[in-house]
């Protein structure tokens, strides 16, 4: 999706009716892209990028994403969150990503865990 937000919106808009759920993997989009995806009820996976020192713009954008559409990922073995940069990313670092999101959103960590678990179930239609 890098440098292809307009193309992606055009494609998603064209096929939205045929898709049950849309996941924007490893979301790093602009505010405009986020706004368009919100209109299409997309889900967003957030990775270790939200912990990076130079990700202030992304952190501001994700504040506008609805919590009921957020899931978390490590994207292992890549995108290791701070303070573990330089190491191979592992699933155990998911906790670091969720804790950072909790701080960004000033939201209770337990609520985020509960909501994101529910989101996984809805997104992947796990009952």
Question: Which residues fall in each region the model found?
Answer:
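Active-site phosphate/pyrophosphate- and oxyanion-stabilizing loops and adjacent acidic/basic residues
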Residues: 59-60, 99
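Active-site micro-motifs of SAM-dependent methyltransferase domains
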Residues: 44, 78, 122
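Divalent metal-binding pocket/active-site signature
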Residues: 1-40, 52-53, 60, 65, ...
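Short glycine-rich anion-binding loops that position phosphate/pyrophosphate groups of nucleotides
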Residues: 49-50, 77
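A general structural signal for short secondary-structure boundary/capping elements
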Residues: 67-75, 115-122
């Amino acid at each position: 999706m890098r440098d292809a937000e307009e193309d992606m919106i055009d494609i998603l808009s064209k096929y939205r009716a045929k898709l049950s759920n849309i996941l924007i993997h490893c979301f790093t989009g602009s505010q405009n892209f986020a706004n368009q995806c919100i209109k299409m009820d997309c889900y967003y996976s957030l990775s270790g990028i939200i912990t990076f020192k130079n990700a202030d713009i992304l952190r501001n954008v994700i504040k506008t994403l609805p919590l009921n559409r957020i899931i978390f990922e490590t994207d292992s073995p890549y995108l290791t969150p701070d303070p573990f940069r330089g190491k191979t990313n592992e699933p155990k670092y998911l906790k670091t990503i969720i804790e950072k999101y909790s701080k960004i959103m000033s939201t209770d960590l337990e609520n985020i865990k509960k909501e994101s678990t529910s989101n996984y179930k809805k997104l992947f239609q796990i009952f």
